[in-house]
């Protein structure tokens, strides 16, 4: 509902804000809406009381205004709704009317709800406690829901584990069954062997059958011979009959007797033959019976084998069914798991929904805050759901990958099977080659024996040679070790020399030694640099020599390794010597490496020594705490080198020193007041000069507006801040005035800096400058103060001289008049100096104490700012004119800066010269800077003392202060306008500089802005780590330097690297090309080269470690090493997280959130102004730092200058001795005042500030160290990832392992990136709810400005600054323009802007403002006291009763001091209590962090153990899968062998059938012979009976016998052919089985068999008459038709006839016409079961019926044939007539035989339509095993994911509890501190008013 109000309505003519004054809800990055974005006409914004500042309270008037505005808006909305309804009724009168009405009603409801929410906004403050209780209750509910979900998940896990155990048991049972099956296969193998032996016996029996056939052939021949003899006898009989008929009757008796004898002989012969034949027949029958018995035994064995195979098939089917049931159970488990996951998600979502509904109800009743918290919780849970969804998607992807891998594995399995077959073939070939190899081995043995003899001879000669070589190498090694030791000594000596030189440098850093010996230091530095460079060159040469030597040693190592391999077995002494040589070589390499390490360590020491020389300056320049600013003189000690006790002692000493300084300061103030009373007469004149100066500065400022460009405006803005810093340095300089020191050093610097070309022209100027230098070195301030007319004259003369120098040509520089006038002025000043030294000598007694002008400058800071601004304006105009006259001169890197910045940094550096150790290090300028800069410097130096004098003598009149305030306000307004323009120019300038830096880098190929950013980042990331070496702590000042530069223009780079490694970014756009000169690029490239060296070292180490492995074992070892490295990195990350959490907690409490709320409340102009002032401050500080670090060159120092300096020092010493005598007298008088003001030290207030600053610096140092470590780790991780990718490309690794390891590496890299971002920007996750949408919107709208987002100096949120109202800002600018940058305002702007807790931010802001108020109140008290003192002095002048007034003033002062002391003590005790409580809280937080880290480590150990267990389980599963695969392969091979045996048995059965047919034919032949014999006997009887009658009726039986004999011959020929074809087919089958191509040839063989049978039967049918066999002629078409239906090649392609084919093959012979039959196909759904090795048959029911009919018909035919044979053999048929009864049964018998054969052929054809099946097949068994493995893998993966998710839930719950606890503690502590500080503020505001009711104190900020 809130979102609908933000969008515009399409139906409205304009937006809602257009007519009613309502504004849409602004983006929530503005937490507090300003007045301009309020509710229309200046009404106060609606905000919670938490967000209102404590100083601002809302009245009833504000609420009334708000209510009236709401009423107006309500009325406007009603009118608008009315008109809209009318318009909608007019325009949309159709069916869409109700939709628009509903839309309008919803909008009305939305607006009403908004109004209700706004009205309930005030109740939020009252309901905060209820919200906390609700939040705690909600947390408990969430915990309860999580615990329920956890219990459910545990139950699911237990169920899953139980199911997994059951499945494992089932798998074990299946394995046992498989083992049983394997034992069964072994028994089958034994049976198969026995069958093969029996088959061999059968073959032998077949050879016996061949002998039988030979015997039968011989009998056939005998039969034919007998037939021929019968024919001859028949011919004889006929002849005899003829003769008998011819012979007469008398001869009949004789012929009959002969005939009787012949017949008797014939009968005897026939009887003998018959007996012999009967014997043979009986013998054959016995043989046939024996063969039949053998056949029956074999059939029994085959039947038993079939039964066993059926049992095995059943067992396999049972196993497959069990496996299918297991698969179903696994699927059910998966479905249960899915349901449980869905239930868990629903159970998580349901309580969340209920909670949301409850919170909505409570929200409508109570407040909106609870809803916000619940929405945050919902967002977290939603993010968790999103992460879980992503994990599920990733799991699905993994599952897909696993399936793909399984498919690949299957393909590989097939390929491996093929390879196995090929290996079998190769094994056969290898068996052949074994014999050849054995022969070759014998030959080789002989050769080896010969070679061994030769080697023994050679070995005898080798020891002498090796010993000589060894001695020579020992000498070389000794020489190398001696040279290495010498170089080590040289290195140690050089190190000692460097250390001595550095110690000397450190000891020489005192003031007097530097004054007297600056040229000696320069020469020492030059002499140190030259031997360093020589040493570096010599070291490089030695390093190259060592590399050559190491290369030679590596070659020698290879040679010796080869020798060691040859001599391993024979000579052990040589091996020991070689090992010694290798050990020596390793020692030498270690020495070389140690030398290199020493070299690098020396370089690091040198760099650290240089840094130590530089670090005091950086520490001083960027120290941000109040105490460090007050005590800049004592910055020579560094906190990091001391222990805690030493630091405490130092702090106590510093506090004592500050007290002494304060007391001396008060005493000096008193004396200065007395002296100022004496010089009252000159004050009137000074007022007029001051006002004239102010007018001049105003005029100069007006001219600046029109003349100077944008860059000069920016520089003028810099000058304001620089002048403040000058005043600060001046205030802290003690009795030695800052401008005097500056003038002195400037003269010294520029005296030697001018070019030698103008030496003649400038000789007079040099003399003048030396005079002025002596004048200023004598500290001529009192004379200048008393003589302002002299100052004005000197300034005018200098101005005149500079103008003349600018107008004239470069050769006309010297004007004699002006020079003479300047000399006269200098002489006058020197004369007056001698007179004024005695009167003003007291100011030089305590040169270390602060001058009273420090306090005056604090009081009148704004007036001084205006005056100094006018000075800077004048110098700018002058320098612009000089820039126009000399454009042709060349500048170096320092010339790129504007002259004003140079001047200001010079002033600051001179202020720094007051520190011990830096007094004589005067800054040097390059020769390119001209004398014009010197003159402008002199002018300003002459103008600043005059200005300060005016400020010092200014009376405290309210009118002048008001005028000055008005002028300052006008100037500030103009500055704001200029700064807006400067911002735009700065943005362009920074982008151009980044582009130029990207072009300057040689490695960056594309010149675009993101590339430049990347180059800059990578260039400076490695620098801090290299500077610090292996140290873990840095100087606190360097950290603050980094943090202070976060406000500079180049924000990103200064966050990473310290600014002394960067070239300064210029403020002027014109000098950009000059800025990017060779020196700046050199410094940039130097830092980058150091980084690249470090990275290359890591890369080379990584590349040297990578040797491409050939085997997987080496790869596994590599992966293991990488995993150990990963563990190490994870431990490092854990430690870094500890440090980061500690540091974040401290930073957020101390200073992390000061500026975010302030920047939101502040107007934009003030934010811009403070940002620019911060940037200019840090730029100036950096310039100062760089100039201090720049070494002095020997050209600057001149001999004359040194002599003049020495003379001046001698004179000053004499004067100091005089002054010290006077000071001893004055010391007793001043001692009483010192005791009075001793207790007013501000150090007591600032001790806490100092401790906080020190803690902050240490914490930020830790963050910086951890960031450097993160950078190094991230680089190392990237190199590791590259190396791992190269490993994967170089060798074959398991893709799953590689993917897992790659994911781990990427996760580690992501963690390191997150840590880097965290250390750079702080917490980015806990942003306010609006920041994500805001970022998305900005990314969409500002895609073109992507480079600016990285380079612009302004952050998206306003910068951290003091949040005060406009009045407070103005008063703050008038009263307390402190030059010191507050440590809290500069630290961590990004963390401060991103901290989400508004309440915490407001409390911390209040703490800061209260601390400010406290400091300001102390300062105002001091100011009031000073005013009282001054008024007392003024009244003392006019009054005579001085002692009475002074006593009263003394009493009031003492009472005030006592009161302030008590108040300060109370405040200090409160602050100590607060600090102790904070320390306790910090200790508690640390303890909780330690516990958390311990729990994390424990969890990591558990995770490692679980991972190891999972890996072990995976290995076990893989081994089991391999075993299962092996078993399945063995089962498949055994089944194939069984099928082959069965096929062989089938072939044997066919042979037996053929033999049965032969036996039947033989039986038939025997029966025929018997019949022939019987008929022959009958014929003989008939012939006897008809011998007398002579009938001729015996021809019919003979003719029938001839036909029968022909048929028998045809049958015999057919049987012989079939036997021959069977033998050939058998031989072919054996060959094909041996070759393994049986499957391809089966179809062809069956076709050949059918073709042969068809040809045989066709021949038979052609030979016979149609009349003799009518049934055969009818069924002949069926026979030919059967040839067209070809047999399939394999059982899987076994055909099934269609309906038409079945009809054509039916029993009805008439319907079986020659219809074309197509190739049949398998029955749908059954071909999956078809296999060769199946033990079941499958067919269509039609085919089965047809086969049944054929078999029944055949049975009937056989029964008829049996009847016919019985009738033929019965004695009744023999008794009947033989002629008629013989021919008819024989023809019937033959026709029935033919039909029986046709029936058998049809039956065989129908049998071919049956095919073998097995349910289920072996392939499915293997698939089932694979599926079980997949399911197990999925179950284990799901188990792991559940475990990981549970761990994540537990960790998040713990983190939530800990964060809530921490927030509660912080909130309680902040409430306590808030109350304490509020009491303190009340005390501070009430007490001064009670103490001074009459005095008018200035308005305080925040009042």
Curated annotation (Swiss-Prot):
Q: Which residues carry this modification: Phosphothreonine?
A: 1193
Pfam families recorded = CC_CDK5RAP2, Cnn_1N
- Coiled coil stretches, renumbered: none
Record's compositionally biased regions (Basic and acidic residues): 266-282, 1025-1043, 1370-1387
Region: CM1 motif; residue ranges are 51-94
Q: Answer yes or no on keyword Phosphoprotein.
A: yes
List the protein's name. CDK5 regulatory subunit-associated protein 2
Report the source organism.
Answer: Rattus norvegicus (Rat)
Name of the gene this protein is made from? Cdk5rap2
